[in-house]
Curated annotation (Swiss-Prot):
Pfam families: PPV_E1_C (PF00519), PPV_E1_DBD (PF20450), PPV_E1_N (PF00524). Residues 407-557 form the SF3 helicase domain. There is a cross-link at K514 (Glycyl lysine isopeptide (Lys-Gly) (interchain with G-Cter in SUMO)). It is found in: Host nucleus. It catalyses: Couples ATP hydrolysis with the unwinding of duplex DNA by translocating in the 3'-5' direction; ATP + H2O = ADP + phosphate + H(+). GO terms for biological process: DNA replication. It comes from Human papillomavirus 47. PROSITE patterns: SF3_HELICASE_1 (PS51206). Keywords: ATP-binding, DNA replication, DNA-binding, Early protein, Helicase, Host nucleus, Hydrolase, Isomerase, Isopeptide bond, Nucleotide-binding, Phosphoprotein, Ubl conjugation. One of its GO terms (molecular function) is DNA binding. Its EC number is 5.6.2.4. This is Replication protein E1. The modification Phosphoserine is found at S81, S89.
């Protein structure tokens, strides 16, 4: 027992496996073994019956039919139009798991016979044509649902070129191409106030609500829906670019940007304007606001189209005369701004000789104004000028300033009276004194209110520097120096006397005229200079001794404005011996304003 390893089992279980097999004499017979194997559980393993042919021909026929059906399906898939398949199941046909591959093109052609390339290109370029099924028209406002909208979405997704599909559907719905009504903006950042927007497959409720929601953004709205297409003409209150318009439409109509076509309209195309004008008269069109200006100009007959047949220069001259415009630049700019309201201005802008007419207009206005000035007396001129001044002022500020300069007001008033009446030897007044005493400011304020002319001795080298004296009622020669005094002493004695002189004018023969009342300012007291003794009797002088006073805010203490001079002349009208305007017809019989244009047929007499 010492050789046994491991633990010993309990009693009765000494061995855990059978070590030897028990022999049996019964199994020694081979015949019995074969008989027992034949009668095993797997019986009838071999079929020893006689063979017959069976139904093999039917099986072969079934296999041939199946193969023929497969070949037929392949031919149908190759040659049959997808339209038949789409009619069977449109939704199933619209589902595509793999994207369509575009045809490939080689950058460099190979130098061979071309046979292989031809076969390859034919195999690669063949792409199945997609035919979009016809979509039913838009239902009435009380009907419709999400099913039709889903069909429109499906039709748009099936198309390979969505923009071309939208353009085709737009033309099919409205009978006119989208590009025939619009002009193209390639940039998304270009702003415009007017936009034509076409939206595909909009829900009916959102389509109706957009008519009210867009009114807060637009001055004019034109909306129409046919079939699945909706057309908008929007005139926004402020300029918008395409991106802003798309954002507004997608938010309001709950559509994708691929469903939108947007371009600005053609503003100068009469046919396009007639489309919008006549379209608003048809059924199913909603409009809000007045017609845009470009539609009205191209379609509505009125003063801007029927009456603006020819340009009338006299109307332009009358306008410039009434507005006191003499310069060519002012006339051109002002009359161009008048174009939206005046038919004659529109005709002038359309003319090829705008500059020629502007020059002629300015020339005629100067002629008329000069003739009007010469026809007026000094009293009429002053009365006309001060009544053009708006507002009221204090005449006492002028009197206080003269007293501040220690000038006798009675003497100044008498000298001004003689000056305005052009009394010989009293036709010129001189303000002299130290610098910064207000001489030029006082003289310039008087010249401004009376619309006089200013002379500059810097132009004395030209023989035409005195030409403005023949075109005004009063003139000012500022800052007279010694060379100017010498010139006046030598050449202007007769002019200062108030007698007729020969005045040389540019492009014209010398004219016979009198010098108008002349005001001089200088730092030199000519009465204290013996060299100019011949001028002493021709010039009345007033000395400005004190510096011009200023306030703490650097504004003049004495207001020498147009309103102050208006009050001055009104208050001292009789003291200056100016004529009463009642005697000249101001309060008597009515006087017609000057008219230089032809009277219209319907004008009141």
């Amino acid at each position: 027992m010492a050789d046994s390893k491991g633990s010993t089992s309990k009693e009765g279980f000494g061995d855990w496996c059978i070590l030897e097999a028990d022999c049996s004499d019964v199994e020694d017979d081979l015949g019995q073994l074969f008989e027992r194997d034949t009668d095993s559980d797997i019986s009838d393993l071999l079929d020893n019956c006689d063979l017959d042919q069976g139904n093999s021909r039917e099986l072969f026929h079934q296999q041939e039919c199946k193969q023929s059906e497969e070949q037929l399906q392949k031919l149908k898939r190759k040659y049959l139009s997808p339209k038949a398949v789409a009619q069977l199941s449109p939704r199933l046909e619209s589902i595509s798991l793999s994207p369509q591959q575009k045809s490939k093109r080689r950058l460099f052609a190979e130098q061979d016979s071309g046979l292989e390339l031809t076969f390859n290109n034919e195999a690669e370029d063949v792409t199945p044509e997609v035919e979009v099924p016809a979509i039913d028209s838009r239902p009435d406002d009380d009907e419709g649902g999400s099913g039709d909208v889903d069909i429109h979405y499906t039709a748009l997704l099936r198309s390979s070129n969505q923009k071309a599909t939208l353009l085709a559907k737009f033309k099919q719905a409205f009978g006119v191409g989208f590009n025939e009504l619009t002009r193209q903006f390639k940039s998304y950042k270009t702003c415009c106030n007017h936009w034509v927007v076409s939206v595909y497959a909009v829900h009916d409720d959102l389509f109706e609500s957009s008519k009210q929601l867009l009114q807060q953004h637009c001055d004019y709205i034109w909306v129409r829906g046919i079939d699945a297409m909706s057309l908008y003409l929007l005139c926004f209150k402020a300029g918008k670019n395409r991106g802003t318009v798309h954002k507004l439409i997608t938010t309001m109509l709950n559509v994708h940007e691929q469903q939108i076509l947007s371009e600005p309209p053609k503003l100068r195309n009469t046919a396009a304007a007639l489309f919008w004008y006549k379209g608003c008269m048809g059924p199913g069109v909603f409009t809000h606001g007045p017609y845009p200006e470009w539609i009205a100009q191209l379609t509505i007959l009125g003063h801007k189209s029927a009456e603006a047949s020819a340009f009338d220069l006299s109307v332009m001259v009358q306008w410039a005369f009434d507005n006191n415009l003499f310069e060519e630049a002012d006339i051109a700019y002002g009359y161009a701004r008048l174009a939206p309201e005046d038919s004659n201005a529109v005709a002038w802008l359309a003319h090829n000789n705008q500059a020629k007419y502007v020059r002629e207009c300015a020339m005629m206005v100067r002629y008329y104004k000069k003739g009007q000035m010469r026809d007026m007396s000094m009293s009429e001129w002053i009365y006309t000028r001060i009544h053009e001044v708006e507002g009221e002022g204090q005449w006492s500020s002028i009197v206080k300033f003269l007293r501040y300069q220690e000038i006798n007001f009675i003497s100044f008033l008498a000298a001004l009276k003689d000056l305005l009446h052009s009394v010989p030897k009293r036709n010129c007044i001189l303000f002299h004194g130290p610098p910064n005493t207000g001489k030029s400011s006082f003289g310039m304020s008087l010249i401004k209110v009376l619309r006089g002319r200013v002379l500059s001795f810097v132009n004395s080298k030209s023989q035409f520097w005195l030409q403005p004296l023949g075109e005004c009622k009063i003139a000012l020669l500022d800052d007279v120096t010694d060379p100017c005094w010498v010139y006046m002493d030598q050449y202007l004695r007769n002019g200062l006397d108030g007698h007729f002189v020969s005045l040389d004018c540019k492009y014209r023969a010398p004219m016979q005229t009198k010098f108008p009342p002349l005001i001089l300012t200088s730092n030199i007291n000519v009465h204290a200079e013996t060299n100019y003794r011949y001028l002493h009797s021709r010039i009345k002088g007033f000395e400005f001794k004190n510096p011009f006073p200023m306030k703490a805010d650097n504004t003049p203490q004495f207001e020498l404005t147009d309103q102050s001079w208006k009050s001055f002349f009104t208050r001292l009208w009789t003291h200056l011996d100016l004529s009463d305007q009642e005697d000249e017809g101001e309060h008597g019989e009515s006087q017609r304003a000057f008219q230089c244009s032809a009277r219209t047929a319907n004008e009141h007499l």
